[in-house]
Every structure is written in structure tokens, then in C-alpha cells.
């Protein structure tokens, strides 16, 4: 939870009062007093299973679920599995006789992860704030307006990564060599794109747009 409150004033004639008596100021301009409240929530569950066969073959499977109040109601939960496999070839009989090789392992894995960067606590909701003061029937009245363009369909940005690699150790692991290739793809990327005003109140709208891939050694 994040809360805040701040006032400002102008025209305090006595410096001895400082901020201890803001009421002594000659004026308190509009916009000089404000407050905020944010209460985003995140719930997570996770499970993991590891299995090793003959001290040679290893399997690890995990699943994570994250639920956030910052995305749309239809996309609250994101589920992110991962799996990895490895083969310790040094445990094979046909390789044990090679004394110079102390380690030789092949491994591969796949996993998904989620990201909410760029989404504030209430981006999916239609929220308002004070805009100014106008006179209504000779009385000052505060007007209200939208804080930002809301998007109730926001969802998790997701990255999927696959990798395959090998580890080689020589001469009692005095020399260790590692080679790895990876490929990752990000989908439903969060991006603030240009929109017309009107019908929108502002010229930017945050949405899940596009994808991006990376690969390398």
C-alpha cells in the first residue's frame, strides 16, 4: 500500500513559522494540496518436481502462477511453466575410461516468465482527478477529469526462452568449457502507442502490442 498527502502555501511573512503553521500563509494555490492512495495486490503459487535416474538423467519441472490486480479482470492470472533436462555423460560406462575428461554434460530447458513493467496500479480503471476550479452559482467548484486513458484488456507480457548447452571439464576440471545457444521470444509486449484526441482524452494508450525475439550463443 502506498499513500501520500502534501500541501503547499505561499506568502508566509514570518520565517520563524516555517512549515509548522501553513495556515498563516497568505494564499494556498489550487494544486498545492493533494493526496494519493495505491493498493496493488499480487498473489503467487509455485510447485516444483525434480527427478534423477541412475545419477545420469535429470528432470526438473516447475509451474508458477501469478495473479495481479493491475491487469484486466479477464487476465488476472498468468501461468509460467518451465522444464529442464540434463544428461551426465561421464556416468556412462563407455566414457569412464577417458581419464582426461572429468565432466561432460548435455542440458536443455524451456521456460516462460511474466512482466508487468509499465502498468501502474489503476491503468485498467477509469480514474479521475481534479482539473481546476470554476464558478457555479457564484460558488467555487472543483472540476474533475480523467487521469489517463484506461485499458481494461491489459494482460501479462510473456517471455518464452529455450536453451541447449554442453559443459566439458578436462584434467580434473582444471579446464572447463561451456557452450550454449538460446532463443527467446516476448509476446503481448506492453507498449504505449499514439491514439487520436478525441475520442481519447490523452494521446497515449498502453496496450499489449507486438512481439520480439532474441537468440545468441
Descriptions of predicted regions:
Residues 1-217:
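Extracellular/periplasmic, surface-exposed regions of secreted and cell-surface proteins
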